[in-house]
Amino acid sequence: MSLQAFETSPSVAPLQPLHLIEEISHRVANEYTEAIATLHLAAAGTGDARVRAALGGAAARLRAHAEAHRALLAPAAVGPVDLADYVGQVCASMTRASLADHGVRLLVDADEIWLESGRSWRVGLIVAELIRNAARHGLGGGPGAIRVSIAKTCGQVSCGVSDNGRLSGAAAPGRGRRLVEALAAELGGSVDWWFTPAGCLARLEIPMTLAPAR
């Protein structure tokens, strides 16, 4: 086969980074579905009750993680979506997937805010990453509380994620922080962290709409 067959056609525009993430996410979701189906088939094909129960439990756990993954896919809606509802679904799926099993209480207090679907998706990605960092680093993988608050003031959306852990600023996660800052920049906003003896607070501030590029 000619190497030329593998060249990208100049008429095909390259995918933007977040579009690429979306495409990969859909493929991962399909892989979850196939893995769950395989576990169900294996469970149905065994006569050992303990093995069947273990396979069923593994399938249920994988299904919960798949649900959390799907919650972070870009909203199907083209127009504005209710940010509170969208983030609430993300938080609920993360609780079912892992937080509840570690004794983490995830509390959500969000105003009804209608935001363009692409912006809502990015906020959801940021919130999910901040929750993961709070659970893993702030709470150290153990029990505790994480609070998500979303409010609108003077044309700005303010989103805070706080925990009651003991993470110091010096130990702040690096890779997750860079991801959050990059997404915040795409939204035309910023994110700041505060570390106190009572826990960590990360606050995202973004405009309701992104000003057109000059």
Identify the meaning behind each predicted range:
Residues 104, 155-159, 200:
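Short beta-strand element(s) in the Bergerat
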Residues 143-155:
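Short beta-strand/loop element within the Bergerat-fold HATPase_c
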Residues 19-33, 37, 41:
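Conserved phosphoacceptor histidine of two-component systems
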Residues 159-165:
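Conserved DxG motif in ATP/Mg2+-binding regions
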Residues 34-38, 48-104:
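Conserved DHp (HisKA) dimerization/phosphotransfer helix of two-component histidine kinases, i.e.
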Residues 169-198:
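ATP phosphate-binding glycine-rich loop and adjacent ATP-lid/helix-beta elements
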Residues 160, 199-210:
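Short C-terminal beta-strand
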Residues 7-25, 79-81, 99-129, 136-139, ...:
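Conserved short strand/loop->alpha-helix "switch" segment adjacent to the catalytic nucleotide/phosphoryl-transfer site
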